[in-house]
């Protein structure tokens, strides 16, 4: 009898907790003009200590899948893949590091150099040169501005849910894509979803304000020594 009573109490407590969390107060974004919601989302993202970004982008017609952790004022790190060629990326300040799979190095450096670079990191500038375009992915403000900078006319479709989270949906009339922004609490971006991820990419944002330790790899090879 005591066990049964305890179980009932636990279930009741969980139900109460669940009801409380589902009633989170609206942040008012559902009633704002679409462009203002975008502005608020970018501002919120810029003020966050950290974020996880996963999904895909399209660069020069080529899809790039990614899973990155970005830490404000530090840099970012994570894994990416382009045309099936996997590589890891780290940026710390103005330094960038990349480590490709054997297939990646063979594709971009040739078989001879690839054998020398097996399981090695390359080091270069994050501001200029071969790695600059990649390292912009580890700056949340630049990533969002790039992703949202070319949108068409946006329409605020109001409050809805996305994967169980209360969000505001902004629809791009020209592409059919949708930007989801949190409808409760701080208006962080939640996801950018395109009708054709292969052509336009789709991104998910999460773990806002969570930070991770990002450290430089030891023994990195200077990209300049390879002519990069």
Regions found by a protein language model. Name each.
Residues 1-10:
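N-terminal export and membrane-targeting signals
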Residues 3-4, 20-228:
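Subset-of-secretome marker
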Residues 11-13, 157:
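Exposed boundary/loop context
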Residues 15-18:
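C-terminal motif of bacterial Sec signal peptides marking the signal peptidase cleavage site
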């Amino acid at each position: 009898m005591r066990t049964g009573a305890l179980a009932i109490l636990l279930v009741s407590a969980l139900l109460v907790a669940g009801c409380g969390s589902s009633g989170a107060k609206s942040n008012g974004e559902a009633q704002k003009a679409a462009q203002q919601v975008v502005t608020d989302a970018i501002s919120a993202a810029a003020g966050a200590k950290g974020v996880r970004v996963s999904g895909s982008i399209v660069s020069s017609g080529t899809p790039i899948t990614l899973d990155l952790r970005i830490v404000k004022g530090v840099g970012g790190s994570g894994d990416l893949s382009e045309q099936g060629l996997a590589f890891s990326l780290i940026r710390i300040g103005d330094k960038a590091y990349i480590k490709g799979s054997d297939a990646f190095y063979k594709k971009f450096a040739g078989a001879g150099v690839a054998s020398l670079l097996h399981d090695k990191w390359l080091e270069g500038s994050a501001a200029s040169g071969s790695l600059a375009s990649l390292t912009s992915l580890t700056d949340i403000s630049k990533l969002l501005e790039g992703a949202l900078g070319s949108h068409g006319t946006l329409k605020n479709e109001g409050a809805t849910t996305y994967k169980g989270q209360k969000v505001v949906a902004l629809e791009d009339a020209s592409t059919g894509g949708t930007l989801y922004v949190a409808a409760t609490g701080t208006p962080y971006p939640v996801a950018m979803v395109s009708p054709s991820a292969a052509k336009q990419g789709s991104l998910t944002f999460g773990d806002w304000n969570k930070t991770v330790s990002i450290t430089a790899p030891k023994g990195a090879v200077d990209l300049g020594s390879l002519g990069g």
